[in-house]
Amino acid sequence: MARIDGRTKLGMIGWTLLVGFALVAGAVAQPAEPAIRPPAAAAPLDDGQWTMPAKNYASTRYSELAEITEDNVKTLQVAFTFSTGVNKGQEAAPLVVGDTMYIVTPFPNILYALDLARPGAPMKWKFEPNPEPAAQGVACCDVVNRGAAFSNGRIYFNTLDGHTIAVDAATGKPVWNTHIGNINIGETITMAPLMVKGKVLVGNSGGEMGVRGWIKALDAGDGHVIWTAYSTGPDAEVLIGPDFKPHYDMDKGKDLGVTSWPPDAWKIGGGNVWGWISYDPDLDLIFHGTGNPGPWNPDLRPGDNKWTSGIFARDPDTGNAKWFYQWTPHDLHDYDGINEQVLLDMTWQGKPRKVLVRPERNGYVYLLDRTTGEVLSAVPFGPVNSSKGVDLKTGRLIVNPEKETSTGKVVRNICPTASGLKDWQPSAFSPKTGLLYIPHNNLCMDEEGVEVNYIAGTPYVGMNVRMIAGPGGHRGAFTAWNVAAAKPAWILKENFPVWSGAVVTAGNVVFYGTMEGWFKAVSATTGKLLWQFKTSSGIIGQPITYRGPDGHQYVAILSGVGGWAGAIVSGDLDPRDATAALGFANVMKDLKDVTTPGGTLYVFRLP
């Protein structure tokens, strides 16, 4: 990595050199930097349960369970399976609380409870919320659901038609149901909620429908809305006040959520909060991303389009913003900003720092000081030509003018695509290795801006997209990233995008799934394939591991292809339409040849 005038720069050639190093190094143990750990308050000692999709507030997706090791993982066998009854994209993480597993399906968002204390884990109960069927027609990218959360004897989850529901974890009886989304304007909810200090944190989807983004805090007791913070509009509605202290000048000024847009465009400007939220109890701050501005055609929204494609730090009690950083000002390519942020404490350039690490959709692994929002490092983790780096003095992404899109102009070979070098699929961090394990894409695209008018409840995109395989011809990869060194330790190439999440354990094993349907275990140190199992459908879910009632370690994954990347299968799209699924259909034509729709839970254990 070269540093020039305060900028972090690593182009396609520099990335190729890094890749060459990592592929060679993949067979050799890389020395881990010491003392990189999540804050103890955000990642308490592992009790063997899995009560939230990210495992803990620090979003490490790391388990201290170690019965399954590099040496014995090859003997893993199926303990039980369960059909969800829904053959759509299964993106959720199962939860395990005590002797019960909880699963939320894609639409119609059925919540199941399985009895882990009985042979075969039979169903304890199921809750059917009966969401509005019309929600399916306004969902951007399949009818997915990313999971539930447990707190104080209740399961909390969202439905596609905009409801947040609390259910008694023991009985399956509903406790409350709050309607917070409006499908008539194209608003849906697909994210997993996060429970913080007696509040249910929820955000909306709908950026491709011109829906204004927000995050809400609901009272966990009765479901009433405590506060709402919008991603666009006046400071008062974004909950920006005197405590707001962004690090960079580009994020300072009054009512930037209005003035950085054409008149009234912020009202339909997106910035939806449909991804991951982390929480630092010591700082008492939540961290959440904001989605892309709408429409995709940048000619229709000149300006930085605050506060989209960025990250907020907020007070969970009031929602008041403390700082903000914009990953991609005036987002040209739907790079969004909702990925997971892993909270870590480490030494950076000789100083102890409270950081968050974020593998972002625009192609960079960012290291931010989570107390201020200062960018400490920003390095590509794959092929990037849409930008030339990040200016560490100003914090601003350096756009490559050759890849700027506009109305009526076809721009070819933009890397990464609108789906990003990595989309929502969450990474995992191991304090044993100091490595972040990143499931991601390797895709490029052609884009053409087109005119579009806003009509409530209909697509508001304004862009023709055709995706193609990235450099090397493989369409996905699984990368182990050395956080301290800001470079890859090893890289595994995959034929299709790796659209599943990852989990890493104290047994030094990393689990992830492929869109062909392989569930894989690899060495956390070297990336060596240790075990794989072919499931009945492509995998886009989030693996977990837990201690069962018998005291043994189990690993679970939902299999069922779909989501944006797998829409050609789950939506049975015509592969002759190169722009179907916002361009994804073109690069995934052959997915139909290797997998079919499904919806099955697989759980594994040692003999």
PLM ranges: what are they?
Residues M12-G26:
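Bacterial N-terminal signal peptides
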Residues E33-V78, I240-M250, V399-K403, M467-I468, ...:
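Blade/loop signatures of beta-propeller domains
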Residues W50-A54, G89-I110, G137-T164, T188-E208, ...:
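Repeat-blade elements of multi-bladed beta-propeller folds
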Residues S63-G181, T505:
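N-terminal cofactor/phosphate-binding cores enriched in small/glycine residues
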Residues F82-A93, K126-A149, N177-A192, Y230-W276, ...:
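Extracytoplasmic beta-rich repeat domains
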Residues T188-H224, D331-V390, K403-C415, S419-W424, ...:
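Repeat-solenoid scaffold signature
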Residues V202-G213, W261-P262, H288-N305, N442-P471, ...:
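Short, conserved, GDST-rich strand-edge loop motifs in beta-rich repeat architectures
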Residues G213-H224, D304-T318, T372, R475-V483, ...:
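Beta-propeller blade signature
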